[in-house]
């Protein structure tokens, strides 16, 4: 996150030129606000793991015999590979939470950006890979996959693979619903379009 923060302007311009947002919106949402969401995910993930006791002692009385005593230890284990499916309008703001939540809880992650907003995700993934390598970890703990043909997305095929255990999706409601119904091997989190229909009417009698 610190390394990403140092390249906020570069990422802001990348968001602007891919999403169509004006620079101020692209910078604030694609830069500091997105990083804030990533940091929030790290904090929540760490807090959740720390709420689980690392050890416990279980004792069972045995009447006139010595009690049975078990010293238990608990180890946090990741679920498996995470898949983060990004959207075109806010490609980092909606990618960082899932990406960093997966990482802090011990899961490798594949970032699948929207075909219209690849560059901001690519910069972020490259930074993550550099940091991982510098710390002696496999760079491809964070990976990215893009469609060879943007008009023929392979997201559904990827999302239903047995290896994928966590899915974080932002996008349209029909595909979000499809993921929830069909990706039964994974824990699926979706941020879909608005759920409430609104009718705005007017009058010529004010």
Where are these regions (language model features)?
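Rossmann-like NAD(P) dinucleotide-binding subdomain of oxidoreductase/dehydrogenase enzymes
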Residues: 5, 47-206
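N-terminal Rossmann-like NAD(P)+-binding subdomain of aldehyde/semialdehyde dehydrogenases
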Residues: 1-65, 101, 134
């Amino acid at each position: 996150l610190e390394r990403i923060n140092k390249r906020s302007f570069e990422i802001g311009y990348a968001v602007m030129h891919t999403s169509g947002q004006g620079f101020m919106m692209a910078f604030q949402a694609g830069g500091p606000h997105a990083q804030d969401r990533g940091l929030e995910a790290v904090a929540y993930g760490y807090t959740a793991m720390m709420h689980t006791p690392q050890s416990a002692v279980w004792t069972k009385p045995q009447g006139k015999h010595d009690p049975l005593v078990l010293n238990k230890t608990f180890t946090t284990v990741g679920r498996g590979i995470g898949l983060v499916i990004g959207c075109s309008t806010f490609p980092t703001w909606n990618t960082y939470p899932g990406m960093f939540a997966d990482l802090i809880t011990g899961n490798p992650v594949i970032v699948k950006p929207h075909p219209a907003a690849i560059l901001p995700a690519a910069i972020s993934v490259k930074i993550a890979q550099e940091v991982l390598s510098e710390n002696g970890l496999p760079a491809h703990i964070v990976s990215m996959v893009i469609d060879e043909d943007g008009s023929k997305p392979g997201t559904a095929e990827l999302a239903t693979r047995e290896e994928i255990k966590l899915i974080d999706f932002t996008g349209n409601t029909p595909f979000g619903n499809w993921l929830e119904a069909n990706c039964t091997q994974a824990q699926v989190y979706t941020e879909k379009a608005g759920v409430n229909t609104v009718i705005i009417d007017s009058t010529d009698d004010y």
